[in-house]
């Protein structure tokens, strides 16, 4: 019989994560690496694990994520949203808890585009009076 999988997509800045949950012991793999080895920072690890800890499902699911684009911070946020969406698919009763914690909301903040005549999005060239 085929193993049960739950799927969630997460996006943050320019990062896109595809997250698969399967019943298991609670391992988290990102791009075929262990979570700590991939992200490298404890704070980002905590961000990724937040949805599992809030719902109390930390040891019930194995998480396998493939993530591309953006930097590691954006990727961590994308994985977090993907996990939250997959948890709702696995158990719809978790939706109010995740919604209240704000884990089902896609963060709309994006990098502002650079404008011509400026050095960056808002940074103007140095002004000289004389």
Swiss-Prot record:
Record's keyword terms, sorted: Ribonucleoprotein, Ribosomal protein
GO MF term (any one): RNA binding
GO CC, alphabetical: cytosolic small ribosomal subunit
Biased composition range(s): Basic residues: 111-130
Annotated region (Disordered), positions in chain: 105-130
InterPro entries the record matches: Ribosomal_Su5_D2-typ_SF, Ribosomal_uS9, Ribosomal_uS9_bac/plastid, Ribosomal_uS9_CS, Ribsml_uS5_D2-typ_fold_subgr
Pfam families documented for this protein: Ribosomal_S9 (PF00380)
Single GO biological process annotation from the record: translation
The keyword Ubl conjugation belongs to this UniProt entry's keyword annotation: no
Origin: domain of life: Bacteria
Assigned protein family: Belongs to the universal ribosomal protein uS9 family.
PANTHER family: RIBOSOMAL PROTEIN S9, SMALL RIBOSOMAL SUBUNIT PROTEIN US9M
HAMAP family: Ribosomal_uS9_B (MF_00532_B)
Name of the protein described by the UniProt record: Small ribosomal subunit protein uS9
Organism, as annotated: Desulforudis audaxviator (strain MP104C)
